[in-house]
């Protein structure tokens, strides 16, 4: 019974250490991204206008308005590109 308890506690300790190490690695990788927050905000602002602009162009050409698909993990919703 003692051996089982020791084995369970050891596994729990290893799991906690592994999880902590994985979180630290993920945080360090996120901080190494080269694009500053201001550039990301500019990209997001551009994406918000992508769908309605393409839709208006199609309306002016007397065609049925079909939303252009957004690319790169974005989709059209409510005439805006939103992150999927």
From Swiss-Prot:
It comes from the Eukaryota. One of its GO terms (cellular component) is host cell postsynaptic membrane. It holds the Pfam family Toxin_20. It is found in: Secreted. Residues 23-47 form a propeptide. Keywords: Disulfide bond, Neurotoxin, Postsynaptic neurotoxin, Secreted, Signal, Toxin. Expressed by the venom gland. One of its GO terms (molecular function) is toxin activity. This is U4-theraphotoxin-Hhn1n. The lineage of its organism: Eukaryota, Metazoa, Ecdysozoa, Arthropoda, Chelicerata.
